[in-house]
Amino acid sequence: MRAGLPEPPGGARPLLIFPCNGNALEALDCLGSAFRLIGFVDDSPEKLGRTLHGHEVFPRAALADWPDALVLAVPGSPTSFRVRSGLIDGLALDPARFARVVHPSARVSPLASLGRNVLVMAGVVITSNAVIGDHVCILPNTVIHHDVRIGDWTLIGSNATLAGRVTVGPGCYLGSGCSVMNGLTIGAGALIGIGSTVIRPVSPGATVAGNPARPLG
């Protein structure tokens, strides 16, 4: 684990989750006893003031109202993942405020490295020498093998398998159920379709899908 990341010192740390979306709902299951959720932060007027599972949805001012709270920022979907870096940077937070949330059932090797603002969901396996960048979200039951490198801002769906020495560039989206052959490189900003089998390198910004995966469009 990277030095300087906040850990709960003998008690649960207060936490805000941005935005109030599907990833945030998934994160609720991952908090365990390490965090105490204050609520959600969102920019959508129709969500503000509502409660979700007993937690209120606040405007961005909440980030300043609770200056000691850690923040988990998990925007992004298959249609919006390429703008998530701007959304997170737009929060203008001290990097030390970003949380790292790992579901208690996930298995992360002590020889792996996780960045800031990383969400690792239930059943994920991350093995030796894997390096997960900042602002990465990994959905349930994905397996990331030895020496894999995941770039900042990347989202990985559920039940994906990344074989050894795969390199995923920043700002990618890997759809649920995809498999990536060992040693391949996925270029920055690429989209891998659901259930795809990737047996060739993927160019930056490309969208590929199928078995084997081929460029679309």
What does each model-identified segment do?
Residues P19, P75, N182:
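Small/polar loops that bind or transfer phosphate-bearing groups
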Residues P45-R107:
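Phosphate-bearing ligand-interacting subdomains
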Residues M1-A61, W66:
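Hydrophobic, well-ordered beta-alpha structural blocks that scaffold small-molecule cofactor pockets
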Residues E26-L28, R82-R84, V202:
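Short glycine-/acidic-enriched loop or helix-start segments at secondary-structure transitions
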Residues V101-A209, A213-L216:
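Structural signal for interior beta-strand "rungs" in well-ordered beta-sheet cores
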Residues I38, A69-L70, R116:
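Conserved acidic residues
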Residues G22-N23, T79-R82, T197:
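Short alpha-helical
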